[in-house]
């Protein structure tokens, strides 16, 4: 069974834990209890493949920012979550993305932009979020942990992005092994 290490990042209070718990336990948590760090595991079937999702739900509060580098190093893919009723959390997405790219030392990291709390009045327009995602070259999903709208879609889209990334890396590794005549070469 293939395992995927997913990390949920974003500002405090955007609903990262609520999204994760809704996926794992089919339950909406409506009271806000700031997370330091929680880990969850769930077996799911995505596109016919049985997968084990290892999900790290992270602290959004600034006082825990020193821990971010560590979990960003181990994550394979990232849900960058903002609240559609909080423009500051939308602006903060850029900071999380830049930190992920720095820690991973790559511009090419599997990531999905998630606009959460879509069941409430918005201050961030859907078009703004779509344009930001397009500029980053990533997918955008709107979610509501309360109604469960888009929750599976967000996590499953990230798994598909990780699969795509793994295949791309595997193919580029295979290409490097090929000589100019199409003969496999290995350096001893």
UniProtKB/Swiss-Prot annotation:
Signal peptide limits = none
Gene Ontology MF annotations: G protein activity; GDP binding; GTP binding; GTPase activity
The topology of this chain with respect to the membrane is: Lipid-anchor
Please give the sites of covalent lipid attachment annotated as S-farnesyl cysteine: 185
Query: Tell me, what is an example of a GO biological process annotation in this record?
Result: Ras protein signal transduction
Family annotation (SMART domains): RAB, RAS, RHO
EC numbers on record: 3.6.5.2
Residue positions annotated to bind GTP are 10-17, 57-61, 116-119
Q: Name one GO cellular component term.
A: plasma membrane
- Is Metal-binding set as a keyword in this record? no
- How is the protein modified post-translationally, according to the record? Palmitoylated by the ZDHHC9-GOLGA7 complex. Depalmitoylated by abhd17a, abhd17b and abhd17c. A continuous cycle of de- and re-palmitoylation regulates rapid exchange between plasma membrane and Golgi.
Q: Where is this region: Hypervariable region?
A: 165-184
PROSITE patterns this protein is in?
RAS
Entry annotated with the keyword Nucleotidyltransferase: no
Q: Which NCBIfam families match?
A: small_GTP (TIGR00231)
Q: What does this protein do?
A: Ras proteins bind GDP/GTP and possess intrinsic GTPase activity.
- Identify this protein by name: GTPase NRas
The species this protein belongs to is Danio rerio (Zebrafish)
Question: What taxonomic ancestry is recorded?
Answer: Eukaryota, Metazoa, Chordata, Craniata, Vertebrata
The gene is nras
């Amino acid at each position: 069974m293939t395992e995927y290490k997913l990390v949920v990042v974003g500002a405090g209070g955007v609903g990262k834990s609520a999204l994760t718990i809704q996926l794992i336990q089919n339950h909406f948590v409506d009271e806000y209890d700031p997370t330091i760090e929680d880990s969850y595991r769930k077996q799911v079937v995505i596109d016919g493949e049985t997968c084990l999702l290892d999900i790290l739900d992270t602290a959004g509060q600034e006082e825990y920012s020193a821990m971010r580098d560590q979990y960003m190093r181990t994550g394979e893919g990232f849900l960058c979550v903002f609240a559609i009723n909080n423009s500051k959390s939308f602006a903060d997405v850029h900071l999380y993305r830049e930190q992920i790219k720095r820690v991973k030392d790559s511009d090419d990291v599997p990531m999905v932009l998630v606009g959460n709390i879509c069941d409430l009045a918005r201050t961030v327009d859907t078009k703004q979020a779509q344009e930001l995602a397009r500029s980053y070259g990533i997918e955008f999903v709107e979610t509501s942990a309360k109604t469960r709208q888009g929750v599976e879609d967000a996590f499953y889209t990230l798994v598909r992005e990780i699969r795509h990334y793994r295949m791309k890396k595997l193919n580029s590794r295979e290409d490097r092994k090929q000589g100019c005549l199409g003969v496999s070469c290995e350096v001893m």
